[in-house]
Amino acid sequence: MANSPSAKKRAKQAEKRRSHNASLRSMVRTYIKNVVKAIDAKDLDKAKTAYTAAVPVIDRMADKGIIHKNKAARHKSRLNAHIKALGTAAA
């Protein structure tokens, strides 16, 4: 356990940041899950709306370092591919 005052402060800061980052990661997962649910329901309009809402959140979390930029790009690419496939299947 931390003994010096500075080590105690750093431990407190690390815990605070960890819980805040966990909350942000959870938020990103929720946005992604909303898009996936709309895709599974084959609701193109709802999927596009959810995707439009999710993209800026995913980008913002990648900029902050909450998720890796490649992971953000991978999520966006795969979700968009599913939505496009849903659009061609509906047409």
Curated annotation (Swiss-Prot):
It comes from Azotobacter vinelandii (strain DJ / ATCC BAA-1303). It holds the Pfam family Ribosomal_S20p. GO terms for cellular component: cytosol; small ribosomal subunit. InterPro entries: Ribosomal_bS20, Ribosomal_bS20_sf. One of its GO terms (biological process) is translation. Keywords: Ribonucleoprotein, Ribosomal protein, RNA-binding, rRNA-binding. Binds directly to 16S ribosomal RNA. Belongs to the bacterial ribosomal protein bS20 family. This is Small ribosomal subunit protein bS20. Residues 1-25 are annotated as: Disordered. Coiled coil: none annotated. The gene is rpsT. One of its GO terms (molecular function) is structural constituent of ribosome. Residues 7-20 have a biased composition (Basic residues). The keyword Membrane does not apply.
